[in-house]
């Protein structure tokens, strides 16, 4: 029996794209900081001159799948990380955005064969989002770790 597992220490040579939503940037900026900290501590060059990492900003979470698809389909990246925050309001808008971004990100991964990490927080309140983006823990770190694991795993599984 063959067992395939991704490794966090095997980041050398991985090319990563990060797509971040500007809307709710108080939250998404913190997620990005946590994500970049994780990637850096695991050997990914996160400097502005990096050839391993590219960063793309989109207006909001709804736009994430479109750019994630462009990046994943480019053949330049081993993994795409998506970061966003959708916070429930008083209208059904939350439900529409959450449904579309989650389906869209999943479709990009399936269609491109490139792992796309779903790092879009969906919370009822701003407080809940902030707790997940740094007050209690920073899920951005987890999304970075997931990217490293999936990038390594995909390299180990024969096509």
Swiss-Prot record:
The active site is at residue 93. Gene3D superfamilies: Lumazine/riboflavin synthase. Keywords: Riboflavin biosynthesis, Transferase. Disulfide bonds: none annotated. GO terms for molecular function: 6,7-dimethyl-8-ribityllumazine synthase activity. InterPro entries: LS, LS/RS, LS/RS_sf. It holds the Pfam family DMRL_synthase. (2S)-2-hydroxy-3-oxobutyl phosphate binds at residues 90-91, 132. GO terms for biological process: riboflavin biosynthetic process. It catalyses: (2S)-2-hydroxy-3-oxobutyl phosphate + 5-amino-6-(D-ribitylamino)uracil = 6,7-dimethyl-8-(1-D-ribityl)lumazine + phosphate + 2 H2O + H(+). GO terms for cellular component: cytosol; riboflavin synthase complex. Catalyzes the formation of 6,7-dimethyl-8-ribityllumazine by condensation of 5-amino-6-(D-ribitylamino)uracil with 3,4-dihydroxy-2-butanone 4-phosphate. This is the penultimate step in the biosynthesis of riboflavin. Belongs to the DMRL synthase family. This is 6,7-dimethyl-8-ribityllumazine synthase. It comes from Synechococcus sp. (strain RCC307).
